[in-house]
Amino acid sequence: MSATEAPPAPAGPQEPVLRKPSTRKRLVPYWLLLPGILWLLVFFALPLVYQASTSVQTGSLEQGFEVTWHFQTYVDALREYYPQFIRSLLYAGTATILCLLLGYPLAYLIAFKAGRWRNLVLVLVIAPFFTSFLIRTLAWKTILADGGAVVDVLNTLHVLDVTSWLGWTESGRVLATPMAVVCGLTYNFLPFMILPLYTSLERIDGRLHEAAGDLYATPATTFRKVTFPLSMPGVVSGTLLTFIPASGDYVNAELLGSTDTKMVGSVIQSQFLRVLDYPTAAALSFILMAIVLLAVTVYIRRSGTEDLV
């Protein structure tokens, strides 16, 4: 090396070599998803496809059913049972509104006022789930029985006079009327409304309420401007969890209602298990599914909560 030759420049920091993950590691997430995908495929997708094919069959149980892609079954089912569809949506919608009116104050109480009693109240809310749905509904037959304490109180307060005028009860009785069915639906699905509401309310930062108070907002204004808008995810979730199963319920209509209060779920159950008219039952199921999906879509869009669900 000559005296005038510059020394070699020091080597700079070498960039770390990114190793490509092995094929086995890249497939791990997909293997974890596989059980859930298989479950949905076997117990949701395949039965749905089977029922869809059943709805376009013609024939009878004696002669056998054959897929003929005959959609007249849908038209006949909708024409014959449209009162049951209207009744189902009316009862489910009324029960959902009642669940919201009853559940929101209770969820608010649990989230902000219950204090050390919060866990106990939550246990009481979910306690009905430890009892059979059927037994809980049967209990309402005793509660609403003719001559019972509840009916006597309602008669004394002349509440039944108003509900009879509205067509929700008969003269002096509640059982086997629309009011009995709605009461059963409201009671059975009320926890599905309370729990999502409580979850949303419990996540609200208490400092927002303090800030509203510092700005001289009244409690009513704070609720209208702060609490209720921030609890909309719970309102939407609770509404969906209540309305969707209530619209297809048949237990309450069968046990607490009469032939005049029959819902479409009762018709589907009867067509499947008694009449054995499988195409009509399947068609009714898909019509109900389409109506509920349409109602839910309109509700979500009108409430402006597309990003919350």
Where are these regions (language model features)?
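C-terminal transmembrane helix and the adjacent membrane-cytosol boundary/short C-terminal tail
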Residues: 2-6, 10-13, 198-209, 213, ...
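N-terminal signal-anchor/first transmembrane alpha helix
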Residues: 2-5, 12-50, 119, 123, ...
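Interhelical loop and adjacent transmembrane-helix boundary motif
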Residues: 23-28, 55, 60, 73-80, ...
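Cytoplasmic-entry segments and transmembrane alpha-helices of multi-pass inner-membrane transporters
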Residues: 33, 106-143, 209-210, 223-224, ...
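Transmembrane alpha-helices
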Residues: 35-38, 43-44, 127, 187, ...
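Short membrane-interfacial helix/loop motifs at transmembrane-helix boundaries
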Residues: 44-81, 89, 147-148, 153, ...
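Membrane-interfacial helix termini and adjacent extracytoplasmic/periplasmic loops
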Residues: 66, 137-185, 220, 256-260
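Transmembrane alpha-helix signature in integral membrane proteins
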Residues: 79-112
